[in-house]
Amino acid sequence: MAPLPISSIRVGKIDDVQELIKSKPNKVPERFIREEYERGVVVSSLKTHHLHHQIPVIDLSKLSKPDNDDFFFEILKLSQACEDWGFFQVINHGIEVEVVEDIEEVASEFFDMPLEEKKKYPMEPGTVQGYGQAFIFSEDQKLDWCNMFALGVHPPQIRNPKLWPSKPARFSESLEGYSKEIRELCKRLLKYIAISLGLKEERFEEMFGEAVQAVRMNYYPPCSSPDLVLGLSPHSDGSALTVLQQSKNSCVGLQILKDNTWVPVKPLPNALVINIGDTIEVLSNGKYKSVEHRAVTNREKERLTIVTFYAPNYEVEIEPMSELVDDETNPCKYRSYNHGDYSYHYVSNKLQGKKSLDFAKILN
């Protein structure tokens, strides 16, 4: 899909946050400071401890044998997670620890390179691949306290080869191996989600065609005034599934919006965080929700995440699945649309909660 014309977008000066903390460690530029209403209500520390344990955890080893009680119990947990939270963590997912640690190490090495080296792979205004900040469309738009490096991975035609770095030397090999593992995980998860919706297990894979997969590495440096900034603006994802890997010993940074309150999600060792994207919300006719989420920063600790977005091929027409629509009891909530058109719409606007999904809603 073609990016927006670069000449039509004026984004102003975008400071690199890693360079900021080197030169002015105790100063937060005005363009990063959020209005008080943007910071929202965060669940209290007492409730946070309780809610950490309410974030659903799905044990994928229990879904390997479909004929036992564990399977049906875990499918029920998965259904409730998708319906009530839109987020869950998966354990025993089958991806080797060495694969996970290697991509973390490579990503860390990339962000540690000199700025001049990273600037060889720029994220141009109106695009979402390369190094920099995405979703910036005006000179007065507030910035996130984050550096990003994003790449299209699969199918090959969505890649921009000029943006795949030559350093670190094993970057491409590591990302290829990791992405293959995550792709297989997404296929498995979609089978289980289909079963949880009462669909045949291959329903999503048959409909998606050659699925689109992209990766974004996010680096959140420490911030001297974390209460004034956001690491990543509130948004839902345009994907079908999103897989979040948080670096080892990561501080709490992800927050999800539940009952109008921001709930921190505590990382579990060797777990991956999965969230439902807008595409699954549409396909399930709103039964499973894509949930607004954001990232916050820490005064003392850095945070590194690796995010994979998995979605249907751009040529696929998306609409609520007929099995999940009933004219009387559950009428169609979303119109039919081309997934490529929605993807273009999503990346052509700044992150604003769930506003992007208005593109597909049927307004009564």
Swiss-Prot record:
**Binding locations of Fe cation:** H235, D237, H293
Assigned GO CC terms: cytoplasm
The Swiss-Prot or TrEMBL record lists the needed cofactor(s) as: Fe(2+); L-ascorbate
- Its gene is LBO1
Gene disruption: observed consequences: Increased shoot branching associated with an accumulation of carlactone (CL) and methyl carlactonoate (MeCLA) as well as reduced responses to these compounds, substrate and product of MAX1, respectively. Accumulation of carlactone (CL), carlactonoate (CLA) and methyl carlactonoate (MeCLA), 16-hydroxycarlactone (16-HO-CL), hydroxycarlactonoates 3-HO-CLA, 4-HO-CLA and 16-HO-CLA, as well as methyl 4-hydroxycarlactonoate (4-HO-MeCLA) and methyl 16-hydroxycarlactonoate (16-HO-MeCLA), compounds related to (11R)-hydroxymethyl carlactonoate (1'-HO-MeCLA).
Keyword presence, Signal: no
Reported effect, G253D: In lbo-2; increased shoot branching associated with reduced activity toward (11R)-methyl carlactonoate and very low conversion to (11R)-hydroxymethyl carlactonoate
> What positions does the domain Fe2OG dioxygenase occupy?
203-312
GO MF annotations, alphabetized: dioxygenase activity; metal ion binding
Which positions does UniProt annotate for 2-oxoglutarate binding? R303
Q: Where is the signal peptide?
A: none
According to its UniProt entry, what is the function of this protein?
Oxoglutarate-dependent dioxygenase involved in the biosynthesis of strigolactone natural products, bioactive compounds promoting plant fitness and soil microbe interactions, but preventing shoot branching. Catalyzes the hydroxylation of (11R)-methyl carlactonoate (MeCLA) to produce (11R)-hydroxymethyl carlactonoate (1'-HO-MeCLA) in final stages of strigolactone biosynthesis, downstream of MAX1 and CLAMT.
Which keywords does this chain's UniProt record carry?
Cytoplasm, Dioxygenase, Iron, Metal-binding, Oxidoreductase
Taken from the record, one Pfam family name reads 2OG-FeII_Oxy
Which cell locations does it reside in?
Answer: Cytoplasm
Q: Please describe the quaternary structure of this protein.
A: Monomer.
Coarse class of the protein's main subcellular location? cytoplasm
The record's cofactor note says: Binds 1 Fe(2+) ion per subunit.
Please state the Enzyme Commission number of this protein: 1.14.11.-
Give the catalysed reaction(s), semicolon-separated.
(11R)-methyl carlactonoate + 2-oxoglutarate + O2 = (11R)-hydroxymethyl carlactonoate + succinate + CO2
What tissues is it present in?
Expressed in the vasculature throughout the plant and in the buds and root tips.
Family per record: Belongs to the iron/ascorbate-dependent oxidoreductase family.
Provide the GO biological process annotations: regulation of secondary shoot formation; strigolactone biosynthetic process
Organism of provenance: Arabidopsis thaliana (Mouse-ear cress)
Check the record and name the SUPFAM superfamilies matching this protein: Clavaminate synthase-like
Additional remark text = The branching phenotypes of the lbo mutant can be rescued by exogenous treatment with the synthetic strigolactone analog GR24. However, the lbo and lbo max4 mutants do not respond to carlactone (CL).
- What's the protein here called? Protein LATERAL BRANCHING OXIDOREDUCTASE 1
